[in-house]
Each structure stands twice: as structure tokens, then as C-alpha cells.
From Swiss-Prot:
Expressed predominantly in the liver. Also detected in endothelial cells and spinal cord neurons. It is linked to Amyotrophic lateral sclerosis 9: A neurodegenerative disorder affecting upper motor neurons in the brain and lower motor neurons in the brain stem and spinal cord, resulting in fatal paralysis. Sensory abnormalities are absent. The pathologic hallmarks of the disease include pallor of the corticospinal tract due to loss of motor neurons, presence of ubiquitin-positive inclusions within surviving motor neurons, and deposition of pathologic aggregates. The etiology of amyotrophic lateral sclerosis is likely to be multifactorial, involving both genetic and environmental factors. GO terms for biological process: actin filament polymerization; angiogenesis; antibacterial humoral response; antimicrobial humoral immune response mediated by antimicrobial peptide; cell communication; cell migration; defense response to Gram-positive bacterium; hematopoietic stem cell proliferation. Changing residue 29 to A: Affects substrate preference. Significantly decreases binding affinity for RNH1. A motif (Nucleolar localization signal) lies at residues 55-59. Changing residue 41 to E: In ALS9; reduced ribonucleolytic activity. Secreted ribonuclease that can either promote or restrict cell proliferation of target cells, depending on the context. Endocytosed in target cells via its receptor PLXNB2 and translocates to the cytoplasm or nucleus. Under stress conditions, localizes to the cytoplasm and promotes the assembly of stress granules (SGs): specifically cleaves a subset of tRNAs within anticodon loops to produce tRNA-derived stress-induced fragments (tiRNAs), resulting in translation repression and inhibition of cell proliferation. tiRNas also prevent formation of apoptosome, thereby promoting cell survival. This is Angiogenin. Its EC number is 3.1.27.-. TRNA binds at residues 45-46, 105, 127. Pfam families: RnaseA (PF00074).
Length: 147
């Protein structure tokens, strides 16, 4: 009986190593996506906005060349990964059915080291994301969608 429990314990421990990533790991990729690309209610959306948010989000050591922030609510962004607000796009990507208010921050100047200077471009775009387990984990691009 003791030997049977030992084998059972060994099988259980080995099985743990073969299980898929946990929900917590999936959520960490989604959380990283939000940190890099989500700002619900931006203040300004001009060059100063870009310089401030890029610094606050830790995207300036070295200076990131370009980054897009999506504005709005998380529920609408998550819905891109479902049929509610997204359609398949290219390989393993989803494109939003609706456009989002976005701000794109582009590095202006030659040095990749702080202080970073950014130029802001504000507009409305459809966004293309990669999804895992129903959550956006990578912003591929934001595009004007032709009617």
C-alpha cells in the first residue's frame, strides 16, 4: 500500500510538469498588454502625454521607438478576441469590428536613451491583436479600415 502511494505521488508530480500554463500565467501576459497599450482616459494626447505615459509605464530604458495606446474600456478590447467585436485577421490574429480612439507615440530624436522625446498622433483606428485564452496579449497594429 505504501509503495502504491509513492507511485501515485510520483505520477502526480510528473503530471504537474506537463499541464498547460495556468490562468495566472495567462493573465500576466494580458496584464503586460494592458501596461503597454491601454490607457482608459488619457490626459491630453499630445507630445507631453506621450513622454509622460511612456516614462510612467517603463518604456524608456532604452527609449521604445513606437508604441500605441488604446483608449476606451477593457471589455470592448477583450471582445476583439471574441466574435462580439472581432474577426479573424491573417494568421492567428483578430481585427476589431469597431474603431478605437488611439494615441501613437513615436520617438523623435537620435538617442535611444532618456530623456526620450516623443511625437503624438491621435486618431481612431481598428486594432489588430493576438489573443490567448480569450484575452489580448499582443498589439500587432492599428489601421484605418476601409468601408
Amino acid at each position: 500500500m505504501v509503495m502504491g502511494l509513492g507511485v501515485l505521488l510520483l505520477v502526480f508530480v510528473l503530471g504537474l510538469g506537463l499541464t498547460p500554463p495556468t490562468l495566472a500565467q495567462d493573465n500576466s501576459r494580458y496584464t503586460h498588454f494592458l501596461t503597454q497599450h491601454y490607457d482608459a482616459k488619457p490626459q491630453g494626447r499630445d507630445d507631453r502625454y506621450c513622454e509622460s505615459i511612456m516614462r510612467r509605464r517603463g518604456l524608456t530604458s532604452p527609449c521604445k521607438d513606437i508604441n500605441t495606446f488604446i483608449h476606451g474600456n477593457k471589455r470592448s478590447i477583450k471582445a476583439i478576441c471574441e466574435n462580439k467585436n472581432g474577426n479573424p485577421h491573417r494568421e492567428n490574429l483578430r481585427i476589431s469590428k469597431s474603431s478605437f480612439q488611439v494615441t501613437t507615440c513615436k520617438l523623435h530624436g537620435g538617442s535611444p536613451w532618456p530623456p526620450c522625446q516623443y511625437r503624438a498622433t491621435a486618431g481612431f483606428r481598428n486594432v489588430v491583436v493576438a489573443c490567448e485564452n480569450g484575452l489580448p496579449v499582443h498589439l500587432d497594429q492599428s489601421i484605418f479600415r476601409r468601408p
